[in-house]
Curated annotation (Swiss-Prot):
The lineage of its organism: Bacteria, Bacillati, Bacillota, Bacilli, Bacillales. This is UPF0297 protein BcerKBAB4_4234. It comes from Bacillus mycoides (strain KBAB4) (Bacillus weihenstephanensis). Pfam families: IreB. Coiled coil: none annotated. Belongs to the UPF0297 family. InterPro entries: IreB. It comes from the Bacteria.
Length: 88
């Protein structure tokens, strides 16, 4: 019964680490543009609502964007914005 007394760790970090926010956003942006949507409006709609219907299946964009948590995407967007617009 010793094997049942130990807590096992489960990690899915490897998949998440291989997905970069920048790559995801560019793929989603291109897919939306190719389908004739306003990419900014659609991405904002997804980030605010969490509804994947804002992102098309074209280029597998919907499943790619769902590999990241929305807060991870928002965090990276804020970091990037501040990095490029901050007065020093």
């Amino acid at each position: 019964m010793d094997g049942f007394d130990k807590t096992m760790k489960f990690s899915i970090q490897d998949e998440k680490q291989s997905v970069h926010v920048n790559d995801v956003l560019l793929t989603v942006y291109d897919a939306l543009q190719e389908k004739g949507y306003n990419p900014i409006n659609q991405i904002v709609g997804y980030l605010l609502s969490g509804d994947p219907a804002y992102i098309p299946r074209h280029k597998d964009a919907r499943s790619i964007v769902r590999k990241l948590e929305r807060d991870e995407i928002i965090e990276e967007l804020v970091k990037s914005y501040l990095k490029h617009h901050r007065e020093e």
